[in-house]
Curated annotation (Swiss-Prot):
Protein name: Delta-aminolevulinic acid dehydratase
Pathway(s) this gene product operates in, as recorded in its UniProt entry: Porphyrin-containing compound metabolism; protoporphyrin-IX biosynthesis; coproporphyrinogen-III from 5-aminolevulinate: step 1/4
Record-listed 5-aminolevulinate 2 binding positions: S274, Y313
GO BP annotations listed: protoporphyrinogen IX biosynthetic process
Alphabetical keyword list: Heme biosynthesis, Lyase, Magnesium, Metal-binding, Porphyrin biosynthesis, Zinc
Matching PANTHER family: DELTA-AMINOLEVULINIC ACID DEHYDRATASE
Function, as annotated: Catalyzes an early step in the biosynthesis of tetrapyrroles. Binds two molecules of 5-aminolevulinate per subunit, each at a distinct site, and catalyzes their condensation to form porphobilinogen.
Active site per the UniProt annotation: K195, K248
Transmembrane segments: none
Binding site for Mg(2+): E233
């Protein structure tokens, strides 16, 4: 009986490495860091084991560790002391993320800073924009100018990439126009344009103190049941001028990553979100899984689905795995 012998190409590790189709590299990784304004704080986030809220005066230690491991792109999330109803801390020249950006750039000029451009960490109500007094929903068009101000302040501080994440309609177009008018035509936009209203975001909201004080975000983030909607969001953001596209979350949305990859030539970014990280960490800490093997399999799955880059809290761990 004649049959195909697929095992020929699996006969040894060297052979398997030779024909491997998908690879994870340090250059693919973006590392998120939570920064706080108070001094002398390095506080582990209970729902994100191994991830910390870090003071500005201690930030250099975290940046140096990440850089020495081979990480060359980071993303800051600010935890400010004071919040208000319009998120003014987001576009404060001396805001916590702006200061973190300056510190990092003074340490390593070649370290890429990806700026998460949103208001939720800075609003006292925890929503991602200005609240309309009548509808009690986020006012899309009134929120856009504040996003533009935030993006410009982040670039002025040294950010290399703007990543708007509040899912307002038209946010890419408005930010692109604002950056261009301010003389920042060469700053790329990494859009969070495909961001689902996911339950996997829970630990992040603990870390950034950004949970909504009322309602939810389902009027501006996407329904997890929808697939075609992602392509509509992609089409809009490409027309508006985005240079890279984020899919968030990632592991439960690998089909969406593949759809996006099949329908664009811009880099696709998978956000391996807090809930995905925490589930894996919890299982590993209980001895139920082999953390290294599971994490690398998860990263491979995102790359195989079509992701070019991965935002992940596992970034430092992955660098250590790759160094073995």
């Amino acid at each position: 009986m004649k049959f195909d012998r697929h095992r020929r190409l699996r006969s040894s590790k060297t052979m398997r490495d030779l024909v491997r189709e998908t690879h994870v590299r340090k250059e693919d990784l973006i590392y998120p860091i939570f920064v706080v304004e108070q001094d002398d704080i390095k506080s582990e986030i209970k729902s994100l084991p191994g991830i910390y809220q870090i003071s500005l005066n201690l930030l250099h230690e975290e940046i140096k560790e990440a850089y020495d491991l081979g990480i060359r792109a980071i993303m800051f999330f600010g935890v400010p002391n004071d919040k208000d109803d319009i998120g003014s801390g987001a576009y404060d020249h001396n805001g916590v993320v702006q200061e973190a950006t300056r510190i990092s750039k003074n340490l390593y000029k070649d370290l890429l800073i990806v700026a998460d451009t949103c208001l939720c960490e800075y609003t006292d109500h925890g929503h991602c924009g200005v609240i309309d007094d009548h509808t009690h929903d986020v006012d899309n068009d009134k929120s856009l100018p504040l996003l533009v101000k935030t993006a410009i302040s982040q670039v002025e501080a040294g950010a290399d990439i703007i990543a708007p994440s509040n899912m307002m309609d038209g946010f890419v177009a408005e930010i692109r126009e604002g950056l261009d008018q301010a003389g920042y035509q060469n700053i790329p936009i990494m859009s969070y344009g495909i961001k689902y209203a996911s339950s996997f975001f829970g630990p992040f909201r603990d870390a950034a103190d950004s949970a909504p004080s009322f309602g939810d975000r389902k009027t501006y983030q996407m329904d997890p049941a929808n697939r075609l909607e992602a392509l509509r969001e992609l089409e809009s953001d490409l027309k508006e001028g985005c240079d890279m596209m984020i899919v968030k979350p990632s592991l439960s949305y690998l089909d969406i990553i593949r759809d996006v990859k099949n329908n664009t030539n811009v880099p696709v970014v998978a956000y391996n979100v807090s809930g995905e990280y925490s589930m894996t960490k919890a299982a590993a800490l209980n001895g139920w899984i082999d953390e290294e093997k599971i994490v690398m399999e998860q990263m491979i799955s995102m790359k195989r689905a079509g992701a070019d880059l991965i935002i992940t809290y596992f970034a430092k761990d992955i660098c250590r795995y790759l160094d073995k």
